[in-house]
């Protein structure tokens, strides 16, 4: 994690997978769907074991819906990026949930989030902390 002194926000980074001199995202999303399951598993294990910290993972809801509408006329690259392996995402996610222990970010990273100045105080009921125009 990296605290952002000026803003008070806390950045919790996603795991990456080093490949051919590049850091590829390995914390979920399209890369979880497009890359082999072993790539995500390896990246998460590395974060847990080598870096000694909990990994963060996310999935887009649409990536769990193989029956989503298909749009005609999309370029091949877009079709691959959006539709490839849609039917595999839910089974992979179930496997990932079995293979590792998971919890909410607020529970796993409570110390970092609670650090003085880590996050600005906010309340939907407090006009002083409400965003302008809301």
Residue ranges and their predicted role:
Residues 1-58:
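Active-site-adjacent pocket scaffolds in enzyme catalytic domains
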Residues 35-134:
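C-terminal domain-boundary segment and adjacent tail
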